[in-house]
Amino acid sequence: MVIITSWKRFKEYLYYDQELELLLDISRMNFSAEFLTELAEPMRDAYHQLQLLEKGALANPDEGRMVGHYWLRNPDLAPTEEIAQDIKETLKEILDFAEQIHSGRLQGEKGNPFRNILLVGVGGSILGPRFVADALASSRDKMKAFFIDNGDPDGIDRVLSRIGEELPATLCLIISKSGGTIETRNGMLEVRRAYEEAGLSFPDHAVAITQRGSQLDKLSQKEGWLRAFPMWDWVGGRTSLLSAVGLLSLALQGIDVAGLLQGAKDCDGRTRRPDTLANPGALLALMWYYSTQGQGGKQMVVLPYKDRLELFTKYLQQLIMESLGKEKNLQGETVHQGITVYGNKGSSDQHSYLQQLLEGPDNFFVTFIEVLKDRQGSSAYMEENSTSGEYLQAFLLGTREALTQKGRESLTITVKEVNAYTIGVLIALFERAVSIYALLVGINAYHQPAVEMGKKAAGQAIQLKNNIVECLKKHPDKRFSVHEIALAIGEEAHQEMVFKLLLHLTTNPEHGVNMAAGHPLPESRFFVSGPIL
């Protein structure tokens, strides 16, 4: 592929907004003017559907829900006064609570001022807050944030070890919309045990962020937790960053949540425009559509040339892949939509997978993210009368040019600096692009049925494990093969899973399962020792 580049084409397709401090350059995507003309009618329909969505239409038909993350930064757009007031009151409560913590009016049980925040959640309830907490962290932060976002026991131990003796001064936020998410429940129970082993009352350090009336909400009220903040059924986890899910921890950290909300609100205003060339969200979605030909399957490599945006790729990975990775369209037809997102940061990635991008399969497009401001204050010159920041930009421009020469497509998003406002802009920009792309290809971007399949299968694996342990304990000292165990518990069709579960059981001490290693390994025998008489 020969990519057409010229100063004229660059100027023709450059989106620039001085107030947003945002530039979007799509000129190195090899689309034609006819492409935009051909998509004009589908885009008009998409704009109409977006209007209906923001007015409260059931944009998530499979779950019968409205989609209202746009209302979080502009409550006056909410379809009812009740929703608008709930959003406004929740934000006020968040800011009031943060002020009480910062002032010391609200302290831990032993009079310890809170200095740390520990967030426990999974998926969208953690990825967004963690990204922004890292992107906007500074030496002026009022509290230090820690995160437990996985069910890995060793990972939990590592986080708690880093907190160490600061646990009495650590406020714990438990985030779960339903209150029944297994990973979050397990994380909460692990953390609760840590507080109790330290002689501390967990409820005196705990805050719930959950849907009203959920299991978690009821638990927090029963035990008298410090506070509970709401999640709403019209906000999905991956778009919940600007609700209490993200705003509470960020306000506690000392981050400018007003700036974050304003940036998102202002960007939303631009991405509502029905003029496609004046709408950065529409342009971004159209480039995805062009690259995938509306069929999905293409890879998006995200390269932010800024350490503060390193976690942005992980955030986008969930936002885009969980939203757009769908087997069926809205008509029930099999389409297997999706865009694979990966990346880390420039210029590190130039020394990892750039080789393949330049000479391997042409099955991707690159999204460069450029930040113009290098640092607070001035920089020293390295060599060639150039600062390290100037070298970093040169690496971005050089990589982009090399890709173009090899016929590999890219687009570039530029912001002036990383601050709360521009982070809000970026979040809103990609949220809108996801919505528009989903409308163009006719899929539901707001559910995740396959994730539920995985949860169901995990529950079945736990039940299978329990059946294995029960079988072995009924026959102490008797050595069973995998086949014999599977036969005994009626799971002959799942011998591989039985074997995998047994390997884990024998590596950990809790159930007392032992292995007499066989050759080959799957021929091993398993047993539980009986009592020593």
From Swiss-Prot:
Q: Which reaction does it catalyse?
A: alpha-D-glucose 6-phosphate = beta-D-fructose 6-phosphate
Which PROSITE patterns does the protein's record reference? P_GLUCOSE_ISOMERASE_2, P_GLUCOSE_ISOMERASE_3
What keywords are assigned to this protein?
Cytoplasm, Gluconeogenesis, Glycolysis, Isomerase
Q: What are the GO MF terms of this UniProt record? A: carbohydrate derivative binding; glucose-6-phosphate isomerase activity; monosaccharide binding
GO cellular component, alphabetical, reads: cytosol
Q: At the top level of its lineage, which domain of life is listed? A: Bacteria
Main localisation, per the record?
cytoplasm
User: What is this protein called in UniProt?
Assistant: Glucose-6-phosphate isomerase
UniProt source species = Desulfitobacterium hafniense (strain DSM 10664 / DCB-2)
